[in-house]
């Protein structure tokens, strides 16, 4: 079994890949002060919850945008599983070409998302990841990662709204029944939802316009992707496991 570890700014998500199936996924909060022993305990407990033992793990692949946490988690894997994990990063084989100004600066999570989208759904494809930050990345029909957009995630934008104002409360980010808010809470929910969705749609249209009307697929992922998947015709597929599919593909290209 392959364990895929996605270390993000907000959460660490573990995927247990048993053959072509994802046998289980687990999420914990990203904390820089967790020790390698704490991460090791999380990992072994999640394995047991899915019916596995540490000895069932054949290998591990890590995708991280938080270097300090990646170091601790990597140490936990070496200690608890006796495995030196593969790490998604510069020099790793993906089968795609990265043609941006500084290829080494492309986030490991974006690279894995693109691999998952391109090899699962084909190109050309626009990959939108609704995480702590919101990213859009274009992959050509030849598998070339050539352009993208990075902007504020909806949670970060929402936190600024109630964090920087005296009388606006924290609200759940969800699809409202109507844009016609009638109290502070519903006005905020409508504003957050529809302005973010509108920005997503405009971004997709702008990509299409500047790419000469290219008929790319739009694949979304990330924790909040599900909220928007059925409210716009511009999104083709929401795939919550996209990064794990990409990591599995990358692993298969690099394993000895």
UniProtKB/Swiss-Prot annotation:
<comment type="pathway">
    <text>Cofactor biosynthesis; coenzyme A biosynthesis; CoA from (R)-pantothenate: step 1/5.</text>
</comment>
<dbReference type="Pfam" id="PF03309">
    <property type="entry name" value="Pan_kinase"/>
</dbReference>
<keyword id="KW-0963">Cytoplasm</keyword>
<dbReference type="GO" id="GO:0004594">
    <property type="term" value="F:pantothenate kinase activity"/>
</dbReference>
<dbReference type="InterPro" id="IPR043129">
    <property type="entry name" value="ATPase_NBD"/>
</dbReference>
<keyword id="KW-0067">ATP-binding</keyword>
<keyword id="KW-0547">Nucleotide-binding</keyword>
<keyword id="KW-0173">Coenzyme A biosynthesis</keyword>
<feature type="binding site">
    <location>
        <begin position="6"/>
        <end position="13"/>
    </location>
    <ligand>
        <name>ATP</name>
    </ligand>
</feature>
<feature type="binding site">
    <location>
        <begin position="107"/>
        <end position="110"/>
    </location>
    <ligand>
        <name>substrate</name>
    </ligand>
</feature>
<comment type="similarity">
    <text>Belongs to the type III pantothenate kinase family.</text>
</comment>
<comment type="function">
    <text>Catalyzes the phosphorylation of pantothenate (Pan), the first step in CoA biosynthesis.</text>
</comment>
<dbReference type="GO" id="GO:0046872">
    <property type="term" value="F:metal ion binding"/>
</dbReference>
<keyword id="KW-0479">Metal-binding</keyword>
<dbReference type="GO" id="GO:0005524">
    <property type="term" value="F:ATP binding"/>
</dbReference>
<dbReference type="GO" id="GO:0015937">
    <property type="term" value="P:coenzyme A biosynthetic process"/>
</dbReference>
<feature type="active site" description="Proton acceptor">
    <location>
        <position position="109"/>
    </location>
</feature>
<dbReference type="GO" id="GO:0005737">
    <property type="term" value="C:cytoplasm"/>
</dbReference>
<keyword id="KW-0808">Transferase</keyword>
<dbReference type="InterPro" id="IPR004619">
    <property type="entry name" value="Type_III_PanK"/>
</dbReference>
<protein>
    <recommendedName>
        <fullName>Type III pantothenate kinase</fullName>
        <ecNumber>2.7.1.33</ecNumber>
    </recommendedName>
</protein>
<feature type="binding site">
    <location>
        <position position="129"/>
    </location>
    <ligand>
        <name>K(+)</name>
    </ligand>
</feature>
<comment type="subunit">
    <text>Homodimer.</text>
</comment>
<keyword id="KW-0418">Kinase</keyword>
<feature type="binding site">
    <location>
        <position position="184"/>
    </location>
    <ligand>
        <name>substrate</name>
    </ligand>
</feature>
<keyword id="KW-0630">Potassium</keyword>
<feature type="binding site">
    <location>
        <position position="132"/>
    </location>
    <ligand>
        <name>ATP</name>
    </ligand>
</feature>
């Amino acid at each position: 079994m392959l364990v895929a570890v996605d270390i993000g700014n907000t959460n660490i998500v573990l995927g247990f890949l048993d053959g072509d199936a994802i046998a289980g996924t687990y999420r914990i909060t990203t904390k820089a002060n967790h020790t390698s022993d704490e991460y090791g305990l999380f990992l072994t407990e999640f394995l047991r919850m899915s019916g596995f033992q540490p000895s069932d793990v054949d290998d591990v692949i890590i995708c991280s945008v938080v270097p300090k946490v990646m170091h601790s988690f990597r140490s936990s894997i070496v200690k608890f599983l006796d495995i030196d994990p593969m790490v998604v990063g510069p020099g790793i084989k993906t089968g795609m070409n990265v043609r941006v100004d500084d290829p080494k600066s492309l986030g490991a999570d974006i690279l894995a998302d693109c691999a998952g989208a391109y090899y699962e759904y084909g190109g050309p494809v626009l990959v939108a990841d609704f995480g702590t930050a919101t990213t859009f990345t274009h992959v050509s029909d030849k598998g070339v990662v050539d352009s993208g957009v990075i902007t504020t995630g909806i949670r970060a934008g929402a936190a600024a709204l109630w964090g920087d104002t005296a009388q606006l409360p924290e609200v759940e980010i969800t699809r409202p029944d109507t844009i016609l808010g009638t109290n502070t809470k519903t006005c905020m929910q409508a504003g957050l939802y529809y302005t973010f969705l509108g920005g997503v749609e405009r971004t997709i249209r702008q990509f299409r316009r500047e790419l000469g009307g290219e008929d790319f697929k739009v694949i979304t992922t990330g924790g909040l992707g599900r909220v928007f998947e059925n409210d716009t015709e511009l999104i083709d597929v929401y795939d919550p496991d996209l990064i794990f599919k990409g990591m599995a593909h990358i692993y298969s290209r690099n394993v000895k």
